[in-house]
UniProtKB/Swiss-Prot annotation:
It comes from the Bacteria. Belongs to the UPF0354 family. This is UPF0354 protein BALH_4267. Coiled coil: none annotated. The lineage of its organism: Bacteria, Bacillati, Bacillota, Bacilli, Bacillales. Pfam families: DUF1444. NCBIfam families: PRK13668.1.
Amino acid sequence: MKMTSKKMKDELMKKLSRPEWDFQYDSEKEVLRIEQKDSKKGINVSLPGVVAKWEVNKEKAIEEVAYYVQEALIAMHKEENSTAKILPVIRSTSFPKQAEEGNPFIMTDHTAETRIYYALDSNKTYRLIDERLLQKLGLTEQQVREMALFNARSLGYEFKQDTVAGNTFYFLNTNDGYDATRILNESLLQSMREKISGDMVVAVPHQDVLIIADIVNEIGYDIIAQMTMKFFAEGHVPITSLSFVYEDGDFEPIFILAKNRKKTDGKEKG
């Protein structure tokens, strides 16, 4: 049979078919590109050159090119993952539990309103870890959780501060994608607890903000409720409009509206 660039493209695509790789064919330049779906890194194969080799070596030429492409892409993937970090991310409990049907994300319960997911972050790409990715990484769920919490503790923090009606509010907003993640840093929470004189209230309205408040009066509770609702509405990745009282390592959701309603009802009765 006569081999053409189009036929060679079809042969190589059959040999290199993998769910994590994509193909792009430029018919004008007669170039087939094979790339990783996640990182978009890949290899360009000039098909006329492969056809010329096929004229001499037949099937062996196709095998050699396929082997070269496969090894190069696998090496790229390993290099990328070797520099990648696993970090926890906070999401709402309404966030999807599966990447797709039959492929659940790796998750850990956090509060009544929030859940912990895990991200593989290589600076350029960011992907939530699901069971299939977990297998590719060759890690257990427990290893992922331990690595993620360790890396979360290494995230820096510098709060901006504001005081209203005697209540002090501390804001963390670095926009690194992991501001809400700092809620998992127990030593950070303990150090803030030591400097707070009233109730310690914590909020993660969206991915890119962590609010810690020193609440000393009812006005403070009203302010944190309004503030959290505003941030929640504005966030690209909203998490929860509720804030939490932090005490002895536990987070208790504050149902501000119910609290205010009871207060109002009491005044009306009196």
